[in-house]
Amino acid sequence: PKVQQNHNNYIISLANLCRWLAEQAEALGVEIFPGFPASEILYHEDGSVKGVATQDMGIDKEGNQKDSFEPGIELLGKVTVFAEGCRGHLGKQLIEKFNLSKDKDPQQYGIGFKEIWEIEDKNHEEGMVMHTAGWPLDNSTYGGSFMYHAENKQVFLGYVIGLDYKNPYLSPFDEFQRFKTHPAIRKIISGGKRISYGARALIEGGLQSLPKMFMPGALLVGCDAGTLNMPKIKGSHTAMKSGMIAAETIIENIRENKDLSIYEEKFRKSWVYKELHAARNVKPSFSWGLILGIIFTGIDQILFRGKLPFTLRHKHADHETLKPASEMKKIDYPKYDNV
C-alpha cells in the first residue's frame, strides 16, 4: 500500500533531529527546560487554562527536601500548548475536564520496542526499509515490525503490538525477542551488536478517537491528542504539522482576537486530516483477525486509497478485550539465546 511506501524518504535519528531543532529554537529565543516536567495545570477563576507548574526537584523518597531542592515554577501564557505525547498525563486531565472525547470512539494504544544494532558490513544495505505483519503473533493479535537500515552500519529494529490483545499470558517483550529469531531477521543482526534499546507507548485510535483539540486557554498537539498514522507507524510528521497549525492559531488569537476553535478548522483543512482520514479504517479492520484485516486493508488502501464511503468504529477500549486467564492458553516462550 502507498501508506507504507518510503521511496525518496530519508532515514535519520529522531533524537539527533530533536537536538538540532532545540538548537534552532534556542537561537530564536525559546527557553527549554529539560528535566523539569510539568506536573500541574493552572486555571483562571473562570476555568480557562492559565499555564502549568513544574514539579519540585530534589525530593527524597520520604518526601523531604534534599540539598539539591529546587521548587517548581509557574509557567503562564495566553495560550498553553500541551505536547506531552501518547502518555501525557496533563493532556488526559484536560480531555476529561473539558469532555473533549464526547461522541468519540475509545482511544486505542500499542506498545513498541526499538533497538539500534550495529551490524556487519555484509548485512547492511543503507536505505533499505522492511515492514512485516503477524508472526510471531497469532491471528487475533494486532502487531507488526519495522526495520530501517541507517548510516554507519546501523539498523533500527522494532516491533509494535496493539494493547487490545486477548490473552493475558502474552508478553509483548518476549514476542519481540522471538521475532528476532526469524531467519530473515537473524541473518541481518547475526554477528552484530545491540548498542541502544527502549520502549514506548503508541496511540493507535486515529481519526475516530481524536478528541476535540482546543479548549479555553489551551491546545492539544501531536499524540497528546492522537495524530499518529498507525498504518505508516509514523507520527512525527503529523505532530509537527499540528504544532505549526497551533502556532498559526495562536498568532491569530493574539493579534486578531480570533477564537481558538479556528485551530480545529485549520486542522480539518490540512493534509494531516486527509492522511488520517485515508488511514482511518485500517486499525479497526484488524479486530476481525489478521487475515481478514490484511484483505480489507488491501481493498481499502490499494483499490480505494482510503476513500471507502464508510468508517469502521473502535467498539471497545483495549482493556475490555482482555479475557480471563482460565479461558486462554498459556504461552511458552523460548529461553533467550543472548546472541
Whereabouts are the PLM-identified features?
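FAD-binding beta-loop-beta segment adjacent to the flavin cofactor pocket
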Residues: A199-M230, S261
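Alpha-helix capping and helix-loop boundary segments enriched in small/acidic/polar residues
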Residues: K104, N167-L170, S209-K212, M230-T238, ...
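Active-site-proximal substrate-binding core of FAD-dependent oxidoreductases
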Residues: G226-K232, M244, E248-I291
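A glycine-rich dinucleotide-binding beta-alpha-beta segment and adjacent secondary-structure elements
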Residues: K187-S209, V221, S326-V339
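Conserved FAD/dinucleotide-binding core of flavoprotein oxidoreductases
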Residues: N139-G198, H237, N253-E256, L260-E264
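Extended, hydrophobic alpha-helical segments in both membrane/secreted and soluble proteins
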Residues: F214, L220-D224, S236-I250
